[in-house]
Amino acid sequence: MAVKKGDMVRAIREKLENSLEAKASDTRFPPYLFDSKGEIVDIKGDYALIKFGKVPTPNVWLRVDQLEEFK
């Protein structure tokens, strides 16, 4: 998926849970990553900075291949 700043996305559970990043940290991901709308605020290489606005959470960097358009 080609992404750009301002796109509304969510994380793909299967790709995030089986990733190298998940194996290096806590694998209990909060549900808002998969269920709520996040806005791409920056992109650096293969990673996108996502801001989830509905809940008071910090922004998070995810690989762009772990994201899908929020429908």
UniProtKB/Swiss-Prot annotation:
Entry's localization field: Cellular thylakoid membrane
Main enzyme class: translocase
Record keywords, A-Z: Membrane, NAD, NADP, Plastoquinone, Quinone, Thylakoid, Translocase, Transport
GO MF: oxidoreductase activity, acting on NAD(P)H, quinone or similar compound as acceptor; quinone binding
Keyword Nucleotide-binding on entry: no
Pfam families: NdhO
Membrane topology: Peripheral membrane protein
Gene Ontology cellular-component terms listed: plasma membrane-derived thylakoid membrane
EC number: 7.1.1.-
Reaction(s) the record says it catalyses: a plastoquinone + NADH + (n+1) H(+)(in) = a plastoquinol + NAD(+) + n H(+)(out); a plastoquinone + NADPH + (n+1) H(+)(in) = a plastoquinol + NADP(+) + n H(+)(out)
Job description of the protein: NDH-1 shuttles electrons from an unknown electron donor, via FMN and iron-sulfur (Fe-S) centers, to quinones in the respiratory and/or the photosynthetic chain. The immediate electron acceptor for the enzyme in this species is believed to be plastoquinone. Couples the redox reaction to proton translocation, and thus conserves the redox energy in a proton gradient. Cyanobacterial NDH-1 also plays a role in inorganic carbon-concentration.
Stated family: Belongs to the complex I NdhO subunit family.
Subunit-structure text: NDH-1 can be composed of about 15 different subunits; different subcomplexes with different compositions have been identified which probably have different functions.
HAMAP family noted in UniProt: NDH1_NDH1O (MF_01354)
Protein's name according to its UniProt entry: NAD(P)H-quinone oxidoreductase subunit O
Organism of origin: Nostoc punctiforme (strain ATCC 29133 / PCC 73102)
Gene transcribed to yield this protein: ndhO
